[in-house]
Design a protein with these regions (language model features):
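A general structural motif at alpha-helix termini
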Residues: 2, 85, 103, 117-121
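Residue-level marker of regulatory loop/turn positions in helix-turn-helix DNA-binding domains and
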Residues: 78-79, 122
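A generic secondary-structure signal for well-formed alpha-helical elements
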Residues: 64, 93, 106-107, 137, ...
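Conserved tyrosine-mediated DNA breakage-rejoining catalytic core shared by Y-recombinases
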Residues: 1-40, 105-115
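Active-site/catalytic core of tyrosine-dependent DNA strand-transfer enzymes
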Residues: 10, 19, 29-74, 85, ...
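C-terminal catalytic core of tyrosine-transesterase DNA break-rejoin enzymes
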Residues: 80-106
Length: 151
């Protein structure tokens, strides 16, 4: 994530097509807690999350090992976080086609003629879903359980 990819006015991160899995540029809404974290970071490099040498962070194996030690949970993969988020969003009432757009998937939930003609990006719906997820995570962290659907 580069600072130049962040739009402060809209609080979004534009992932360039050359770095996305499906080759399409992707716009990600940055919820309030995420925005606060990003704004608290020093701008010592062109990258938002950089090593102390200012280079792109790449040692995910080492980071996962640290998370394993801290949590005591070891039987998981980083990719499981995507499944957890999408499953949690479903419980919050986020429609599958919106979750697909959040993950930048080519929609598996819209098929046939609709898949050919449907070009709406669901930006407002994605923002609402990510804000709802952010509220849910904050509740988990604080211990305050919110069981109501948010979308």
């Amino acid at each position: 994530m580069a600072w130049s990819e962040i739009d402060e006015a809209s609080r979004t991160w534009r992932i360039p097509a050359q770095r996305s899995k499906n080759g399409k540029a992707h716009l990600v809404h940055l919820s309030d807690p995420v925005w606060e974290i990003i704004q608290s970071l020093p701008r010592t490099s062109s990258l938002v999350f950089a090593t102390s040498g200012g280079r792109n962070f790449q040692d995910f194996k080492k980071a996962k090992a640290a998370l394993d030690r801290a949590s005591g949970v070891t039987d998981w993969w980083l990719h499981d976080l995507r499944r957890t988020v999408v499953s949690g969003m479903a419980r919050l009432g986020v429609p599958p086609h919106v979750a697909d757009k959040i993950l930048n998937h080519r929609s598996g939930t819209i098929s046939g003629v609709a898949a050919v003609y449907q070009r709406h990006e669901f930006l407002a719906e994605r923002k609402q879903a990510l804000d709802a997820w952010s509220t849910h995570v904050a509740g988990v962290i604080s211990g305050i359980k919110n069981t109501q659907k948010q979308i």
